[in-house]
Amino acid sequence: MRLAIHGYGATGHYVHELAPDAVVAVIDKTKTAEQVPSYGTLAEMTESVDAIIDFSHPSLLPDLLAYGIKTKTPLVIATTGFSEAELQTIRDASTQIPIFQSYNMSFGIAMMQQLLKTLVPLAGAFDIELLEKHHNQKVDAPSGTAELLLRTIQDLRDVQPVYERESTREKREPNEIGMHSMRGGTIFGEHEVLFAGVDELIEIKHTALSKKVFASGAIKAAEALIQKSAGLYTLETLYTQEDSHVIN
């Protein structure tokens, strides 16, 4: 497998560290790799690759999708902070090439989604709250993974997200789900779903201890994706070995 890394920050470096023989090019405007050719843009890259792993920035999405479509290259998109309009462009592009898009590449988050699918239908009498914690350099809130978990819950229960309560000063409604974000220190990522019932609590929590878990997940996604036809693939379908599907 021949890979290009699009975005050579901390997680991109870990991808290179974990798969040194597979990475044949790095694309980043400000950073270079010593062992392989480095380019400022995808258009400059001369190597042919089986897949591109993207840990860059939403502003680079148009060029990434255009390159993928032009060269028929599968894309693993792990960048966070996309708008709904940008997510729609990913969906549109996936009708032409295989795209794997997830805000969190860890196996544990896929397991957490499966646990929620089991628990949410059973916990109709419980209030649900969602808390995410990240390092003090993260700019988007709530995190993309928190939004992913929210959508998983909403597929099973009619709940509306509430992002702050100070302005309303009203009691909590049964169909609400509180979304809470904390930023500080060097927290890699922590996500917790709280089910609050009468005199009892149920908590599901995932903590990432290193960015390597995201890099490893991206490599596994690339290995699976190069065998697939056009479509938009998710972390959940990869790890549960279900058939691929396009998200409309």
UniProtKB/Swiss-Prot annotation:
Annotated metabolic or biological route of this protein: Amino-acid biosynthesis; L-lysine biosynthesis via DAP pathway; (S)-tetrahydrodipicolinate from L-aspartate: step 4/4
UniProt-listed SUPFAM superfamilies: Glyceraldehyde-3-phosphate dehydrogenase-like, C-terminal domain, NAD(P)-binding Rossmann-fold domains
Keyword presence, NAD: yes
Domain of life assignment: Bacteria
EC numbers for this chain: 1.17.1.8
Residues involved in NADP(+) binding: K29
Alphabetized GO MF terms: 4-hydroxy-tetrahydrodipicolinate reductase; NAD binding; NADP binding; oxidoreductase activity, acting on CH or CH2 groups, NAD or NADP as acceptor
Enzyme class: oxidoreductase
Binding site for (S)-2,3,4,5-tetrahydrodipicolinate: H135, G144, T145
Localization of this protein: Cytoplasm
Record InterPro entries: DapB_C, DapB_N, DapB_N_CS, DHDPR_bac, NAD(P)-bd_dom_sf
Binding residues annotated for NAD(+), in chain numbering: D28, A78, T79, T80, S102, Y103, N104, M105
Record field: catalytic activity: (S)-2,3,4,5-tetrahydrodipicolinate + NAD(+) + H2O = (2S,4S)-4-hydroxy-2,3,4,5-tetrahydrodipicolinate + NADH + H(+); (S)-2,3,4,5-tetrahydrodipicolinate + NADP(+) + H2O = (2S,4S)-4-hydroxy-2,3,4,5-tetrahydrodipicolinate + NADPH + H(+)
Keywords tagged on the record: Amino-acid biosynthesis, Cytoplasm, Diaminopimelate biosynthesis, Lysine biosynthesis, NAD, NADP, Oxidoreductase
Example of a GO cellular component annotation carried by this entry: cytosol
Catalytic residues of the enzyme: H134 (proton donor/acceptor), K138 (proton donor)
GO biological processes: diaminopimelate biosynthetic process; lysine biosynthetic process via diaminopimelate
Function: Catalyzes the conversion of 4-hydroxy-tetrahydrodipicolinate (HTPA) to tetrahydrodipicolinate.
HAMAP family in alphabetical order: DapB
PANTHER family reported for this sequence: 4-HYDROXY-TETRAHYDRODIPICOLINATE REDUCTASE, DIHYDRODIPICOLINATE REDUCTASE
Family per similarity comment: Belongs to the DapB family.
Record-given protein name: 4-hydroxy-tetrahydrodipicolinate reductase
Organism expressing this protein natively: Exiguobacterium sibiricum (strain DSM 17290 / CCUG 55495 / CIP 109462 / JCM 13490 / 255-15)
Gene: dapB
